[in-house]
Amino acid sequence: MHLSPDTMNMVDDGCLSTESYHDLGKGGVSGISGRVHSIDVILGFSKDQDPLLEPSGRHKVDEDQLEEQEKQVNADPYSHLQIPDQTQQQQSVYHDTGLFSTDKCDADLGDPRSNVESDSRSPDIPDEDQPKKKHRRNRTTFTTYQLHELERAFEKSHYPDVYSREELAMKVNLPEVRVQVWFQNRRAKWRRQEKMDTGTMKLHDSPIRSFNRPPMAPNVGPMSNSLPLDPWLSSPLSSATPMHSIPGFMGPGQSLQPTYTAHPGFLNTSPGMMQNIQPMPPPPYQCQPVFNDKYPLEDVDRSSSIAALRMKAKEHIQSMDKTWQPM
């Protein structure tokens, strides 16, 4: 856009003056307060020249309101800040109405536990719905006299009736219920003691303990001569001659050596040779040591085995006697 020299001359000299420049530097609002420089003025149009450019109606009212607001801002630039007196007055009003009271806040924050308890207790629960606490009975401490009388009554009867319990309660100065409870506990203790006693008796009578045999005497041995001979050993040969006179008899100190050997040609020998051969006695019977055992089954087995051995020994002796007879 190009401006003619005539239009440039029509621009007000006050716009380019130093005073207006300083006013614009100090503040945008204060610099505008003196004179409003519109676009029409800058362009050089005056209000009288063109009536179409003249503001009318609503625009004119808005410009007037803006001018008034700018004047008020220039008159009191710190009007948006409150005066201390006014703030104090407002605070006093708040305190009077109770909206800005610190006492209420302190009271609410002072005991939060009470608030919680009040909230928890707010729903009213009837007494029937609340769980009842279990009544715990105190333990009774009996004196020596009371225990003595109760033990005497327990020895007479483990299950006393109501009348005897009441009489005993009056005697020992105790309630009848306590006496009844004492008898119940005493019977339970007695049953436990009986079970323990029966268990120990079974343990003592168990067959495992029967194997603990006493030690054998030193004079008892398999080759001991102090043992008496059984009557079944008394054969005609042994009764007629003593044991030491029998050839082939060995003393306790001699070593066991074979004294009789069987030969296939022994039966085919002549009678003259048979006279020179002396008959050999049977080997001495070794007596087994006797044990005192409590277990009955072992006694039965041992007696049966001994009887069988005796029968075999008798048969052997009879057969040997037949062979010793002269042919």
UniProtKB/Swiss-Prot annotation:
Span(s) of short sequence motif OAR: 304-317
Feature: DNA-binding region: 135-194
One GO cellular component term: nucleus
Nucleus is among the record's keywords: yes
Motif (Octapeptide motif): 37-44
Annotated compartments: Nucleus
GO-annotated molecular function: DNA-binding transcription factor activity, RNA polymerase II-specific; RNA polymerase II cis-regulatory region sequence-specific DNA binding
Function summary: Plays a critical role in eye formation by regulating the initial specification of retinal cells and/or their subsequent proliferation.
Name by which UniProt lists this protein: Retinal homeobox protein Rx2
